[in-house]
């Protein structure tokens, strides 16, 4: 996650996203634009609060990371659940016939 000096989330996957949309159009495949939707979520959280979604651990907070962890790439459980919720909601929007098969579990707040 990268924010600019004004606190706006940066788009860091432009070329990849463009390629995804190109293939989507070429083969008529629906796309869940998780790049944009995750940026929207991060922007709503803001620079400091968005850290709650990532592997940001203080020293001795987790036995696997005794020195702590400052990872702004990989989601923690809460962040992964938020991303999964976005995907599931978009599946419902793109493929309504699948909606009855999707169960949205509440996000754990720890």
Annotate each language-model stretch with its function:
Residues 1-110:
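Catalytic His-Asp segment of secreted/periplasmic serine-dependent ester chemistry enzymes
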